Amino acid sequence: MKHLKGLLLPALLALASSAAAKDPLVETTPFKNELVNLMYFDDSGVALVQELDNGKIFRSHDAGKGWKEIKDVQGLGIIKSPYDNKVALILGEKKHWITYDQGENWDSFETKLPPSPQGPVGWHAQDNKKILLNEIENCFTAPCLGKTYYTTDGFKTDPKTLVDDRRMCQWAKASERFLQGVDKHDDRILCITRGKYSDRSKDFRLLMSDNFFKETEEPVMSSGRTVQGMANMAAVKGYIVAAAKAEHSSELALYVTQDTDSWHHARFGDHKIEEDAYTILESTNYSIQVDVMTSKYVTMGNLYTSNSNGTYFTKNVEHTNRNDAGYVDFEKIANIQGVVLVNTVDNYKEVEKSGQSKKLKSRISFDDGRSFEKLTVKGKDGELHLHSVTNLHNSGRVFSSPAPGIVMGVGNTGDYLGKYTDGDLYVSDDAGLTWELALEEAHKYEFGDQGSVLVAVFDEGDTDEIRYSFKHGRKDTWQKIKLDYKIRARELTTLPDSTSLKFMIYGSRKKDGGGREHVIVHLDFSDMLKKCGDSDFDDEWSVRKDADGDPSCVMGHKQLFRRRKWDAECSVGELFKDPVPKFKPCDCDKFRDYECDFNFTPTGEGKDKKCEPSESFSLPKGACEGDAKSYKGSSGWRKIPGNQCKGETERDKQVERECKDAERPRPKTDKITSEITKFKGSNFMEQYYLERNTQSDGTDNDRGKDETVVMLTDERTAYITHDHGKKWKKAVDDEIVRIYPHQYENNNVYFLTASKKVYYSKDRGLHDSINSFEAPVMPNTEMLPIMQFHPKQKDWIIWLGGKNCEKLGNKDCHTVAYVSQKNGEDSSWESLVPYVKKCAFVWREAGRSVKEEQVFCEQHTNEEKNAPLELISSDDWFKKKDVKFKSVVEFATMSEFIIVATKAEDNTLHLDASLDAHTFAEAKFPPKFFDIHQTAYTVLDSSTHAVFLHVTVNPQRDQEYGSIIKSNSNGTSYVMSLAAVNRNTEGYVDFEKMQGLEGVAVANVIVNVDEVNKGAKKKKQSRITHNDGADWEPLQAPEKDSDDKPYDCDIADKKKCGLHIHGYTERADPREMYSSPTAVGLMLAVGNVGPELTTFGEANTFMTTDAGITWKEVKKGTYAWEFGDQGSVIVIVRRGEDTDHVYYSVDSGAKWDLYQFADHKMRVDAITTVPSDTSLNFLLWGKDSRELFAVNLDFSGLPEFQKECKLDENDPTKGDYDLWSPQHPLQQDEPECLFGHVAQYHRKKRDVKCRNGQRIDQMHDIARNCSCTRRDFECAYNYERDSSGDCVLVPGLSLPDPAKVCSNKNVKEYYSNTRFRKIPLSTCQGGTEYDKTGDVHPCPGFEEDFKKNHGVGGFTLFLAIVLPFAAAAGVGYWVWRNWDGKFGRIRLGEPGGGSAFDSDAPWVRWPIAAVSGLVAVGAALPLVVGSVWRWVVGRMGGRGGGGGGYSGLGGSGFGRAYTSRSSFARGRGEYSVVDPDEGELLGDEESDEDV
C-alpha cells in the first residue's frame, strides 16, 4: 500500500549487475530548490523529480546518477500511470504534458481551468490512451462541482468535455482486477453528479455511461431503486465501492459492485459507517477491508473484512490506531499472502473516557487478520512495537517490499511503542515471525535485489554515513559508506519492485555561506556482488514452519518462494522480475481456515473459540413459524474469504438450532394491528421522530428498520420507542425537562435536565447508546434557545446558559454562550460571549463562502442587561468581534441569505439581507404601496424563486386582513398578487403552499372588506392558484356530498357556491398540512360548500387528487389526517370528539374502510407518522380519562402491501407507477403546461397492490418546455391587476425609465415599458412573450450591434447573485430548517414570557416566526419574516409536523398556547423546484435553516 498523502509522491529506481568492487558507487547531484515528486517508472532506471519553487522537471535515465531538465515544461505536479510504466502526466495550471516513452518526449494539451486538487486524473487500467482529467471545482456556491474531460487517444486531439457538474468520475476499469479478462464495459465511466434538478449534496446521483455521457444510466442498488445522496466512490481491487449519505445524517450506506451491473448494500452488523470516519484499506483480491472509527474524538477504529462479494463485513481487529488524516496502522506484508502488521490501542477505555495518551502495541497476523500475536525479538523476552503508517518517515511501504519475507521497522521493545527518535531499526527475514536488532537509532531503510542488499540511513539528524547489509540485515553484518559531507535524509528509495542494486537518497546539506542545499545521492552496489548460483538459493522457503519443520498452511495453502540464502553474498540479478511464489493446497482445518459468519460474534480464543449469534442475528426466512421447535441454520462459521484449502469440515454444514434460543418473528397477519400504551400525566409535552438514514435499502436486519420516537410527558419522564410506538421504555432514568433533537443529524438527540447534566444519544437511542455530558452552566431561564447546532460539523454545539442564576432574583444572573467542538464531551466547552439573546452558526452548504467557525450573536450593548441589542460576528470564537448592526430586533440565517431586522429611530422596522455574511443591503419595497400601508408585513414564502409578502391593510383586532405581494426572481421588486387576504391577531395568514408541487397555493380572502372596515365580522372565501400567484380562482365545489346528495347552491357559479376550507389561522394544531411532499397532488382539508366559509363545527372533510382542480367530500364532520407509504394509505381520525376508530383508504380516497383500534371511545388529539411519510405505521396521541395514551396503528400486514412496488426510471409506466402531470384549470390549450413546461411525477397506480417502501424521487422528468402564453406572465412592477384581469398602472405612479438598464455595461439593448413580466418559475420558450411586447431599442454605443443582432437582453441572474444589494429583498425562503434560532426567540407559537422549560417551548418549531418590532406604543406589530412550505413537510412528524407555514423573527407575545404537542419530527420536507438553474436568490430545493 503506497502511503502518499503528505509525503512526496515518490517512486523509484532500477538496474543491477554482478561483480566485486570494494565499495558502492556514490554520485551526488545538487539542486537549487527543494524537491518533490521523486518517482521511478516501474521496471526501468528512468526517474523524474520536480523543483517545488519553480515547477521545473528533471529526468534521469540511469537511476538517479545523472539528471537533465526537461525543457519548456513547468508543472504543478507529476502523476504517473499506475498501469503503464511508460506513461506519465505533468499537470500545469492550464497547459499540461503527457509522455508515452518514460519522459523522453512530451506532448502538450490545454484545459480552460487548472486541474482539480482532489484527484485530477482518472486512469483506465487496460487502455493507456483512455484518460479522464478533472478541472478544479467551483466551490463558490458549494457543494463543489467541476468539469471532467476525457481523451481516447492520449490527448493527441483536444480533450472533450465529459460532464460539467460532477463531484467525481472514474472509469469502470479503474483497477487491474476489476472485470479482469472480461470483454465488456471498456468505455464505461461512472460519475457522481449533481441531482436532476438540484445541486444539493443530498441529491447527488451516481450515473454511468458507455458513450461518454451522451446517454446515461442511473444504476439500481440492491433495493431495486436508484439511490440519491452519493458522496464518494473508489475502486478497490476487483470491487467498486460507492457511499451514499442521507440528508440530516452523517451515516453512510456503502454499496459494492463487482461488475457495475449489480450492486449490493454492504452490511456491518451493529456498527454504522459515518462520513469521514472510515478508511478502505489495502484489500485482498477476494475481500474488502475497512477500518471504521469507533469514536468521533478518539482516533481508533475497528477493522472489518468482507466476504467474497463485498456484502457482509465481520470485525477482525478492535481498537486499531488511526490518525486525523484517516490513515490506519495497518500493512500487509508485500508479496506474501495473509501476513498483516497492525498497531492497536491498549488503553482504549481510558482514552475514550478521559482522553489519555494512547498506548500502542504492535501485533502480527499470519491469517489475514483473523488472529494476531505479539512481535518477538530473538533472545529477548519483551515485546517489539513498531512505528507504522500513521507516523511515516519514508515513501512507499512501511515495513516490507516484494523481497520475500524481508521486513524492517523502527521501534522499541517494552510494554508500549515509544517515540520515534527513541526507536531502533529492527529486521526480520521470516516475514515478521521473529525479529532482531539491526541498527541502533532510527533509520530510513530500503530493500534491493530481492533482499540481497538492505540500505539504511540515520533519520534523527545530519549524518555522513550510509549503512548497508548483504546478509538480510542481521546484526553485525552492516557496513558503512562514508560521505564527504553530512546529509539530512528526507527520502531513501529504489525501484518499486526492489529488484535493483541502485538506490537514491534525497536530502539536504549545509551550504558554504549558510543555508542548505538539496541533493540527490545515487548509490550503486552492482559491482560489489557476484551473480548467485543454484546452491545459493533455498528453493522452498516458506512463510513459517510448523512444529515438524514443514511449511505451515496460510490461507489454505503452503506458500513457497525461491529465495537467496541469508549468508550467500551474491546478487540475485533478476532485474525487474518480481519473485513468484508456488502454492500447495492444504486440507481444510476447522480452526485455522474458518472465521465467524455474519451476525455471529466470536467468544474465546484458539481452539476454545466459539461463534455465538449476535444481537442483530435474524432467523432465516420461514424459520420457527407456527409450532416449529427448531430450524436449520448456519453453523456460525464460514470459510475465510480467499482461503484455498481443499475438502470440507463440519463447519461447512448447517446445524440444527432451537427456536427457543431465537426471538420468534411476530405472527404474520393480513390485518391492521394496534397497540395501546398508557402513560401517567396530563399532557404530552414533546414528541420527536428520529428518522433513520433513508439511503439504506431497507433490507438490513440490524440497523435501519427502526422507527424511533422520543416523547416527554408533563411528569418530566422521557420515553423512547424504536418500533413506532409498539413498545415504549424510559429513555433515561432521570427527570427530563426538554428534548432537543439535532437539527442536522437525525441520529442525535439530547435530553436536558434542570441541572447541568445532559443525556444524549448519537445512535437514535439504539444499543444502549445514551450517555451524558456536563454543560458549562445551567440552561438559561429567559425563554431563549439553549442549544444550536452546526449544519456540517455535527459535534459543534452552542449552549446558551444562565450564569449566576442558581438563586431566583439574582441581579447578576445573565446569559452566556459557550461552544463545544466535541459534542459537549471531555470538558470541551469554551466561553463565547456574555449577555446574549441568541447565537448561531453562519455556515451553510450552498451559496455562502464563510469559515465554518463563523458565528453571529445578538448581544446587549456594552454587556448591559437592558441595553439594546447589537449583531456581532466572529470567526475565531470571539477572540475578535465585529459589530454588524445596532438596535437589532432579530436575525435569522437561511441557506443563501442572512436577514437582520433592526429598529430605526422613528420606531419603524428595517430589513437588511446579505449573501455572504459580510456585506448587507437594505430591502427596498414599492414606494407608493408602503405610503398607504404602514402597519405590519409577513414574509410568507420564497420557495419558488419569488418572495410572497403579506402586507397588513387593516390591523384592528379581529378585523385583520391585508394584501399579498410577490417579488421578481431577485426579490427586489414587488407586484400585487392577491388582495384582502385573511390574517389573525398574531400576524399569521391564511396562505399555504402545496407540498411536492411547484406553484400551487391556497389562501382565504375577505369578501366584505368595506363592512369589515366598519367593524363587521369577516366573511371569508377560499382561493387557489396554479401559477404561483399570478392568477387566483375560487375552489371548485364537488357536485355531490359524501351521501351522494347535491348541494343546495349552484356549483357552476364558483363565487357564490364554491368550496371554502379552513386555513392556518384556525387550526387547533398548526402543524397540520393540507398536503404531503411524497403524496404528489393529494390534499385533504376541512370546510364547506356555499357562498362563504362557515364555522369549524359545521365543516366536513374534503380531498383532492389533482392538486386542487377537483374536490370531493370524503366524510361528514372534521377529521385529522395523515399520509403513509408516500400516499399509498391515508388514515383519518375524528377531530374534537371521543372515538374508537379510524378510517383508511388504500386507493387515494376512492373508498374508505373503518378500523376499530379500541374497545371504548377515547379523545384523540393528533395523528402522526415519520416525517418522510414513508411508513405504514401511525401513532394516535390522546387522553383517556386521566391517562395519556399513544396508539400504534400498523398497516404493513395488509395484503395490499406485501410486495414492493417496481419502478423503472427508464420505462416508468411499465411497472406499478404512472406518470402524472399537474394541470392549470383555466388553461384550455395545453393545460398540462405549468410554468412553461410539462412536469412528470411518479404516482402509484391506483389499483396495484404494493408498497412504495424506500422513498422514491417523485419528480421523474421535465418532459418538455412549452410555448409562452398569458399564463406564464404576471403584472410587471408598478402595475396591478384590475377587475377585468388586465394589468394597469398603479394609480399615482409614473413609469420608470426603461433605459436605466443600460447602466449595466453588458446590456446592449432594452425594451419599452410593458405591463407584464415573466413568472420566475416559468421556463417557457417562444410563443407570445408578453414581457417583450414593447419596442426594443439599442443602448447608447451599441447601435451597430443592435442592427446586426436583435437578441434578447436584460437582467441576468448571474448579476443578481454576485451583487450583494440584489439579495436585499430576498427576505425569504423561511423554513424551520432555515432559521438559526431553531430553538427559540424566533417564536414559533409560544406565549411571550415564561421560563425556558415552559410547556410551550420556543423550539416547538411552527413554521411561522413573528418579528415583534415594538413598532407602536402598547401594541407590538409583527414583522413576520419567515415561512415556507418547503419545510413544512419536514413537519414535525408526519404532515402534522410541519405547520402551516411561516417562520418568524420572533418578538414578544405573538403566538398561541397550544396544549397539544403531537408529532414533532425532525425531518423537513422538500419543495420540488424543477428549474435546473438553482442559482436564484431565493433558495434552492431546500434550505438548511434552523429555528
UniProtKB/Swiss-Prot annotation:
One of its GO terms (cellular component) is membrane. GO terms for biological process: Golgi to endosome transport; Golgi to vacuole transport; protein targeting to vacuole. This is Vacuolar protein sorting/targeting protein 10. It comes from the Eukaryota. Residues 22-1354, 1427-1491 are lumenal. It is found in: Golgi apparatus, trans-Golgi network membrane; Prevacuolar compartment membrane. Residues 1475-1491 have a biased composition (Acidic residues). Coiled coil: none annotated. It is a multi-pass membrane protein. Keywords: Glycoprotein, Golgi apparatus, Membrane, Protein transport, Receptor, Repeat, Signal, Transmembrane, Transmembrane helix, Transport. Residues 1-21 form the signal peptide. BNR repeats lie at residues 97-107, 364-374, 426-436, 719-730, 1102-1112, 1143-1153. Belongs to the VPS10-related sortilin family. Residues 640-667, 1018-1047, 1464-1491 are annotated as: Disordered. Residues 647-667, 1038-1047 have a biased composition (Basic and acidic residues). Residues 1376-1405 are cytoplasmic. Gene3D superfamilies: 2.10.70.80, 3.30.60.270, YVTN repeat-like/Quinoprotein amine dehydrogenase. Functions as a sorting receptor in the Golgi compartment required for the intracellular sorting and delivery of soluble vacuolar proteins, like carboxypeptidase Y (CPY) and proteinase A. Executes multiple rounds of sorting by cycling between the late Golgi and a prevacuolar endosome-like compartment. The chain crosses the membrane at residues 1355-1375, 1406-1426. Glycans are attached at N285, N309, N970, N1265.
